[in-house]
Amino acid sequence: NWYYFYTYYCRPTMMTAKQVSGFEIVKLWDADRSLAEMASKVFYGRPVVCDRLEDVSDDVDLVFISDCNGDGSDHLELSTPGLKKGVATFIDKPFAYTLKDAYKMLRLADKHGAPLMSLSMMRTAPTVVQFRNRLAETGGCNFGSIYGGGTPLAGLYHSIALTQATFGTGIESVQAMAG
C-alpha cells in the first residue's frame, strides 16, 4: 500500500514508502529546533540537526525545502544559502510567493550552476500514475472531479497538480467551489 503521508501516524518511525538506495538524509534544520530534532528521531537520529540555516547546505548533494509556512513566502530565504553554494535544490510547492522571489531564485541558481526544481508530490504519486494509466485504458473521460486540500495556497496547488497529473494539461475548463 502507498500512503499520501510516508509514516503511519501511530508508528511514526515506520516508513511506508520504498527507500531509494544511495540516498540518505544527513542534515536537518528548522526555525523551531525541537521540530528538527523530532524529525531526526523519525530517521533514528541519523540526520544531524543544524544550528543555522546556512549549515544545512554544507557538504550535501541536495537541499530539500519543505512546505514550511504554506505559502512559499519563505522559500527565497530558505533556498539562498544552498543556491549560492551551487547545491542542487528542490523546493516543495509553491515555488515562490511572488514572481519577484521566483526570478531571484532562478537567477541565483543560474549564477551558481545549481539545479533547481519545484513540484507537488501529487504529480508523481504512484497511485495517481497508476490511476492515470488505467484511465487511458478506458478511452478517457469527459468529466472529472477532484476534491482538493482546501483554499490555502498549498492545498490549491496540490489540487491543480493532481488534476493535471490525472487528466493531462489539456484541461479546457475548471470550476472551483468552496464552503
Sequence positions of predicted segments:
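Conserved beta-strand segments of alpha/beta enzyme cores
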Residues: E24, V48-V49, P115, S173
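Rossmann-like dinucleotide-binding domain that binds NAD(P)(H)
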Residues: W29, N142-G179
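N-terminal Rossmann-like dinucleotide-binding module
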Residues: N1-V42, M122, A136
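Structural motif
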Residues: N1, D30-A31, D67-C68, Y147-G149
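Beta-loop-alpha module in the N-terminal Rossmann-like domain of NAD(P)-dependent dehydrogenases
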Residues: D32, V42-L106
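A contiguous active-site-proximal alpha/beta segment in oxidoreductase catalytic domains
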Residues: F90, F95-L156
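Core-facing hydrophobic residues within beta-strands of well-ordered domains
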Residues: F23-I25, V60, C141, I171
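Short loop/edge segments at beta-strand edges and connector loops
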Residues: D51, I91, S120, Q175-A178
